[in-house]
Amino acid sequence: FDIYVHNDRVYLVEVKSHADIEDVEWFYKRAEIYEKIRGRRPDKLVLVAVHIDEDAYERAKELGIEVIYGAIIP
């Protein structure tokens, strides 16, 4: 993932051409690791994907990950 900091706010951004549920879970896990190392929770998690599986999209919503996508694959 990439880290974007602006006005003391931290955003973690993951960019994928195709995101599946494993990608979502791994991104969330890495965000937890970031929090443990830095002692600070990211202000926002953002997943950008051209295509995302429907179950991955639903899981991202459950985890509070903002998703920017081109198409949801059923």
Model-derived segments and their meaning:
Residues 8-9, 40-43:
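Short glycine-/polar-rich loops that comprise or flank the Walker A/P-loop
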